[in-house]
Amino acid sequence: MTRSRVGFGKMPAMPPTRAHGKLCYVEIPAVDVARSAAFYRDVFGWGIRQRGDGRTAFDDTVGEVSGAWVTGRPPSPEPGLLLYVMVDSVADTVDAVVAHGGEIVQPIGSDAPEVTARFRDPGGNVIGLYQDPS
């Protein structure tokens, strides 16, 4: 299966990288799967799809990481293992997070000189935002 990579401009469709140690799949706890899927689609542009078993799944914008929302598992409301999503602009993404029902729990500037922020998604999970400084 090939996926197109987007985000830094259109690139030719190519298969995802397969390498030992690569982060490849994420399960995100959710109370309302449809609401969580819409949140990540609208904020980050993730592709949303139905898997063969009927579960709602996602693919990131560059076709390198996929995953699904899971019910019956408590959210991660406090950072333990903390995932960061790379974005073009943390400031713009903070606005999108709030506009789509998320909550900012660590504002921009707390990790200076890194450009980061943390938010709580509709399922109660805390996730980080990261902007490449270059």
Short names for language-model regions:
Residues G45-R51, E103-I108:
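Short secondary-structure junctions
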Residues P15-R18, T71-P75, A99:
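A short alpha-helix capping/helix-coil boundary motif
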Residues W46-G80, V126-D132:
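Conserved short beta-strand elements that form part of the metal-binding/catalytic scaffold
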Residues R3-A37, E64-V65, L81-L83, P133-S134:
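N-terminal beta-strand motif that seeds the catalytic metal site of vicinal oxygen chelate
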